[in-house]
A protein has these predicted regions:
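N-terminal mature ectodomain segment of secretory-pathway/periplasmic proteins
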Residues: 31-106, 134-142
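Bacterial N-terminal signal peptides that target proteins for export
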Residues: 1-12
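Edge/loop elements at the starts and ends of beta-strands within beta-rich repeat scaffolds
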Residues: 44-48, 147, 210
Length: 246
């Protein structure tokens, strides 16, 4: 699987801390992130047995275009990754996040970081609630980073000492009057590029109880960036059928 490296790390746009479980929120979290997570479906999250989505990235200035499809079972930890290599041949890898220590090196070093990256983009409101280590602050009526208008600014910062892939990251979430994120600015805590990503949060769809922003347009270090999700669906407990996002 050494060929995986070329297309999993070719553009890990941004990566948050490692924790991706729904059991890490024993401590009381700030009301603002709890309410935000509930807006995106937190109260019914336990009904979801599997999630499927394709993370798509287009960076024209860097001539980078990629698509990564994930099927994730949050309760079991199983992840299936699908993409195509440089020759257009299909690649498929299945592993369990609870058994990473025994996984192949390419899975640990390339596939898993790509999964974390894409999953944070996909359901970041949940991570803001689950990640106890993150410091959360809020300010009312802040100017939007893209377009006109104002919104509540909720800043989620990961301390340097936390570890993970990129400690010190900050996510500035601009929350509109309906309680949904309308834009955000990502500040990387480490030296890797891009160091600043600013995009919209739009194209909202629901897959079962899950609310997802499927369209993110803006810039990465000042250059055009388009991140979007397709093929979004969930499989609910007790059912073998996929419920497509609408």
């Amino acid at each position: 699987m050494t060929k995986l490296t070329r297309f999993t790390t070719a553009c890990g746009l941004l990566v948050g801390v490692l924790g991706l479980t729904c059991t890490s929120h024993a401590q009381t979290r700030p009301p603002v992130v709890e309410q935000l997570a509930k807006t995106y479906g937190l109260d019914s999250y336990g009904q979801i047995d599997a999630v499927r989505y394709t993370f798509n990235l287009d960076l024209p200035a860097l001539k980078v275009t990629l698509s990564r499809t994930w099927t994730w079972e949050p309760k079991t930890g199983q992840v299936t990754y699908e993409t195509k290599d440089k020759e257009g041949k299909p690649v498929k890898v299945t592993y369990n996040r609870k058994q990473l220590s025994s996984a192949a090196a390419d899975v640990r070093d390339d596939v898993e970081p790509a999964f974390v990256n894409d999953n944070y983009w996909f359901i970041f409101p949940f991570h803001a609630y689950w990640d106890n280590s993150a410091n959360v602050t809020e300010k009312d009526k802040q100017s939007l980073p893209l377009g006109k208008g104002t919104a509540k600014l909720v800043s989620v910062k990961y301390p340097q000492e936390v570890g993970g892939y990129t400690p010190g990251d900050t996510w500035d979430l601009y929350v509109g009057s309906e309680g949904r994120i309308v834009a955000f600015v990502y500040h990387r805590g480490g030296p890797k590029k891009p160091s600043n990503v600013t995009t919209t949060w739009a194209g909202y769809k629901k897959a079962g109880p899950l609310l997802v922003s499927t369209e993110h347009r803006g810039t990465a270090d000042g250059k055009p960036a388009h991140i979007f999700f397709s093929n979004v669906a969930v499989k609910l407990a007790g059912s073998d059928k996929w419920v497509d996002a609408q």
